[in-house]
Each structure stands twice: as structure tokens, then as C-alpha cells.
Regions:
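Loop/turn elements at helix/coil->beta-strand transitions in domains of secreted/extracellular proteins
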Residues: 14-17, 36-38, 85-87, 110-112, ...
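A ligand-binding cleft/hinge motif common to bilobed small-molecule-binding domains
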Residues: 27, 41-53, 100-107, 128-163
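Short glycine/serine/threonine-biased micro-segments
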Residues: 33, 92, 166
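Acidic, polar ligand-binding/catalytic clefts
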Residues: 5, 9, 13, 17-82, ...
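Bilobed "Venus flytrap"/periplasmic-binding protein-like clamshell domains
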Residues: 1-11, 44-48, 65-124, 139-143
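Alpha-helical segments with a strong preference for the paired helices of cellulosomal dockerin domains
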Residues: 34-36, 125, 129
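A short acidic, often aromatic-flanked loop/helix-cap motif at beta-alpha or helix-coil junctions
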Residues: 28-29, 121-124, 164
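A short beta-strand structural signal in non-transmembrane regions
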Residues: 166-172
Length: 172
């Protein structure tokens, strides 16, 4: 919100001229390339393929994060070393998170069931309802999502960070 207001003040001369458009991960790049939005200021990972293939400009990194996992405390899992083949994992589709999950589980030699959603609250709610063994996204997102679960203290973010996520705004 502050980044968007600052851009509006600098470019348009008025911080109140900003218009916010909620977008899913799947919609974000299309909205930017089509001109529906001018600046994509959400948790978007700057990757080589996105930098080279999409034709958009990442203007800098404003936050470094990393992907992790949240599980129920009563699952007995203390780290990703406790993961087993066949477990289900909730996450957002069309994201680096989905790709990192696939790479991570393949490297561990584990089959898993992807339970994918376009919106973070759908993934969180499905995990919270017990329909996934784990929930994965950036660790800052896990910390935030944990606070809105019915019983936050019944869930734990595992210690491993499986990726480095340079996040920042994107423009045409």
C-alpha cells in the first residue's frame, strides 16, 4: 500500500490517485501486460525466466524471503526430514512456490499430492480444515496465514527454508 501511494505521489503528484486491483498469482502478469494495471506491487519473485521471457521489468528487490512449510503440531513432523511419500501439500498454483515444491519433493524422492489454489486464503483454509498435511508458501506468508487459523498455536512453521525469494515490484 505504501509503495503504491509513493509511486502515485511521485508519478501523478497525488498519493490518493492510486487504484488497487486485487489479483491472483495467475492473473497478475496478464493484468500488467494488458495495461489493466501499471505497477504490480505484490509478492512477486524476480526470477531469470520471468526477467527474460515475460517482457516486463522488475524494478528492484524490496524484500527477501524464502519458502517454508507449516504443519500441525500433532503431526509429529519437526522438519522436512519427517516428510513421507503420499502426503498432501496445499499451495498456490502458477507460482514459484509450486515449482519449488515439485523440485524439493523430487530431490527427496517423495511423491506428494498437490492441492493447488489460485488464492492464498483458499490454500490456507483448506489446510486449516485438515485437508492437507502441509501448507507451503514464503515464510512471511506462513507467519501471517498462521495468525488467522482457528487455533494458531496448533500449527508450526518448520525450520527449513527451501528457496531464496527476491521479491519486488514489476512494471511494463
Amino acid at each position: 500500500v505504501d509503495v503504491c501511494r509513493a509511486v502515485a505521489a511521485a508519478v501523478l503528484g497525488d498519493a490518493d490517485k492510486v487504484k488497487y486491483t486485487p489479483l491472483s498469482a495467475k492473473e497478475r502478469f496478464t493484468a500488467l501486460t494488458s495495461g489493466e494495471i501499471d505497477v504490480l506491487a505484490r509478492n512477486t519473485t524476480w526470477t531469470l525466466s520471468r526477467d527474460a521471457d515475460i517482457g516486463l521489468t522488475f524494478v528492484g528487490v524490496n524484500f527477501y524471503d524464502g519458502q517454508g512449510f507449516m504443519v500441525r503440531k500433532d503431526s509429529g513432523m519437526k522438519s522436512t526430514a519427517d516428510f513421507v511419500s503420499g502426503m498432501s501439500v496445499c499451495t498456490n498454483i502458477g507460482t514459484t512456490t509450486e515449482l519449488n515444491l515439485a523440485d524439493f519433493m523430487a530431490a527427496k524422492g517423495l511423491d506428494y499430492k498437490l492441492v493447488g489454489f489460485e488464492k492464498a486464503d483458499e490454500a490456507r483454509d483448506t489446510y486449516g480444515a485438515g485437508r492437507c498435511d502441509a501448507y507451503t508458501t514464503d515464510k512471511s506468508g506462513l507467519a501471517a496465514q498462521r495468525t488467522v487459523l482457528a487455533n494458531p498455536d496448533d500449527h508450526v512453521v518448520l525450520p527449513e527454508t527451501i528457496s531464496k525469494e527476491p521479491l519486488g515490484p514489476v512494471v511494463r
